[in-house]
């Protein structure tokens, strides 16, 4: 078991879901389901196993998981994932015929039946269901609700079920094709969750039976209503409409966004895509950018429709994507979007938790890093990063690691003061100059190593300030990221060269942690500053609203939209005079000219 798996095992949730074991090439070699992901996945790596399982475990280099909201959901998702990926250690399932369906036959008097043979020309099929027990339970309920043929009697001879109101396959009922087609549609609507009409009808019958003292019959109706209520806990991973759709959910935290996409094909959730990246604007804006880039990639098939969360503007997405965009409001479809959001949150939290656990791997990392760079052991490391969007509110940040752990009391933020426009090199020069002039002036402890989040240009700028302006001899390294914002290369030396850094080494984990932390700290500060500047600029020019009162409003309401929604009395409660509060409301609510 490698270190990555050890850490990920500690972070597994106590939730139902599916897990996907992968080999060294990232290929899915086994898909499983679990009532409790933590217990089930851990069991592979502890205790004794049979020969087949030991062979599987020997090939596992990584795993991922998808959280579901029920055990049955996990089972149905497992079916879909196995059929889509055909992992070599799973039982090979050629098609859906291994699973039971409920069928309405195309006979003159249609019947409800359970079958594993799908021939679409001879009936209407619903499913597949995870096992025969689930299919039988649902069919039993359908038999009580819908009067399909339930007997072998000739049409002119009524049966026992006819007297119960559960079989209309008799000439005395005078049914025609339109009647049975309507009944077939009622079943379809019912299984798709549109059961209010039936429940309301049963409720009225129950009340009527109770009023006439027919308590046994009232109890039967009550039991039917309860059975329907149980069925309402439907599976969100299979949809009867058989449509192709992509379902998006996202979650943001600590300057990072995680987007999860569920790929639903022929009504089945068969795959998911996960992407995590730092975001710089409002989350909704960066999500729109992401979804546009997602479908520009030719490998992504454009489905019939795309589901998005409530806070995203559907018209904007439709303009970008070019297909039907849906923001589900309720029911099964809304729950599927919520499931994508939940998995995005879980994935992002796992990323942060793994980074926290990486701190434990710093034993020996500092010494190894010193040996790698041929410098004394870097006990104190100071790292820098710039953050700006098109030159607006440019800032920089410094984080400090002592003995491989963050020393947050030593973190520093910098507003860029001398640079106009987006100029990373000039910004880096200003920040390094300000930091180390203060170190010299105040007699502060200099670092053993400076790490710059950037490439050759930024490192050379920092070196020029440190060596030529201050005459200091502090080693400086650069960390470059790839196009996925992941730690990619370590630059060091004079001239700068790429230092080979094994990705499974302790020193790589330390540098990865430092780079992520300084980036998080910088963009969080940048976002706060932009928000504050935007807030203040829109309050400028309002008579009687000076810096102190703006600060009071910012502290209490957090954002302009909150002020716009606030009542005058709420604003006055913050210590703002009534005349100023009224002027403020009028100014914010006036349409732009």
UniProtKB/Swiss-Prot annotation:
Residues 196-231 form the UVR domain. Keywords: Cytoplasm, DNA damage, DNA excision, DNA repair, Excision nuclease, SOS response. GO terms for biological process: nucleotide-excision repair; SOS response. GO terms for cellular component: cytoplasm; excinuclease repair complex. Pfam families: GIY-YIG, UVR, UvrC_RNaseH, UvrC_RNaseH_dom. Its main location: cytoplasm. The keyword DNA damage applies. One of its GO terms (molecular function) is DNA binding. Residues 14-91 form the GIY-YIG domain. Interacts with UvrB in an incision complex. The UvrABC repair system catalyzes the recognition and processing of DNA lesions. UvrC both incises the 5' and 3' sides of the lesion. The N-terminal half is responsible for the 3' incision and the C-terminal half is responsible for the 5' incision. Belongs to the UvrC family. This is UvrABC system protein C. It comes from Streptococcus agalactiae serotype V (strain ATCC BAA-611 / 2603 V/R). The lineage of its organism: Bacteria, Bacillati, Bacillota, Bacilli, Lactobacillales.
């Amino acid at each position: 078991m490698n270190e990555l798996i050890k850490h990920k095992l500690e972070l597994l949730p106590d939730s139902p879901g599916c897990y996907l074991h992968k080999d060294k090439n990232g290929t899915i070699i086994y898909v499983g389901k679990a009532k409790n992901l933590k217990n089930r996945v851990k069991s592979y790596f502890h205790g004794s196993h049979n020969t087949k399982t030991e062979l599987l475990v020997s090939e596992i280099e990584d795993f991922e998981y998808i959280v579901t909201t029920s055990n049955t959901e996990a089972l149905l998702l497992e079916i879909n994932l196995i059929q889509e990926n055909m992992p070599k250690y799973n039982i090979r399932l050629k098609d859906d015929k291994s699973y039971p369906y409920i069928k309405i036959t195309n006979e003159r008097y249609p019947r409800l039946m359970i079958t594993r043979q799908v021939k679409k020309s001879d009936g209407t099929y619903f499913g597949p269901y995870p096992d025969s027990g689930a299919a039988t339970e649902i069919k039993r309920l359908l038999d009580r609700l819908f009067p399909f043929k339930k007997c072998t009697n000739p049409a002119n001879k009524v049966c026992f079920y006819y007297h119960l109101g559960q079989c209309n396959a008799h000439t005395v009922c005078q049914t025609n094709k339109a009647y049975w087609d309507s009944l077939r549609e009622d079943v379809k609507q019912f299984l798709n969750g549109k059961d209010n009409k039936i429940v309301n009808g049963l409720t009225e019958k129950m009340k009527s039976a109770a009023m006439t003292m027919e308590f046994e019959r009232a109890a039967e109706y009550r039991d039917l209503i309860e059975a329907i209520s149980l069925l309402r806990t439907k599976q969100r991973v299979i949809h009867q409409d058989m449509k192709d759709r992509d379902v998006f959910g996202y979650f943001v935290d600590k300057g990072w966004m995680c987007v999860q996409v569920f790929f639903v094909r022929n009504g089945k959730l068969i795959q998911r895509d996960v992407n995590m990246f730092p975001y710089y604007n409002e989350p909704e804006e960066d999500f729109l950018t992401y979804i546009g880039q997602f479908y520009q990639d030719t490998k992504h098939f454009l489905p019939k429709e795309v589901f998005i969360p409530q806070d995203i503007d559907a018209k904007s997405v439709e303009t970008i994507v070019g297909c039907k965009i849906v923001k589900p409001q309720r029911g099964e479809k809304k729950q599927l979007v919520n499931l994508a959001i939940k998995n995005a949150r879980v994935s992002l939290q796992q990323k942060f938790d793994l980074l926290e656990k990486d701190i434990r791997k710093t034993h020996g990392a500092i010494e190894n890093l010193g040996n790698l760079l041929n410098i004394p052991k870097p006990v104190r490391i100071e790292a820098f990063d710039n953050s700006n969007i098109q030159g607006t509110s440019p800032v920089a940040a410094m984080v400090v690691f002592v003995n491989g752990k963050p020393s947050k009391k030593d973190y520093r933020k910098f507003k860029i003061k001398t640079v106009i426009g987006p100029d990373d090199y000039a910004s880096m020069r200003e920040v390094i100059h300000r930091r180390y002039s203060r170190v010299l002036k105040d007699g502060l402890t200099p670092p053993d190593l400076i790490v710059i989040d950037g490439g050759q240009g930024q490192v050379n700028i920092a070196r020029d300030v440190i060596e030529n302006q201050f005459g200091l001899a502090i080693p400086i390294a650069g960390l470059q990221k790839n196009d996925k914002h992941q730690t990619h290369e370590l630059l060091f030396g004079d001239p700068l060269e790429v230092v080979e850094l094994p990705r499974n080494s302790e020193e790589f984990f330390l540098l990865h942690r430092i780079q992520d932390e300084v980036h998080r700290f910088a963009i969080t500060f940048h976002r706060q500053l932009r928000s504050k500047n935007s807030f203040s600029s829109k309050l400028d020019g309002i008579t009687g609203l000076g810096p102190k009162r703006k600060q009071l409003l910012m502290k209490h309401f957090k954002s302009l939209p909150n002020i716009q929604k606030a009542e005058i009395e709420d604003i006055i409660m913050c210590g703002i005079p009534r005349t100023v509060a009224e002027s403020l409301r009028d100014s914010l609510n006036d349409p732009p000219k």
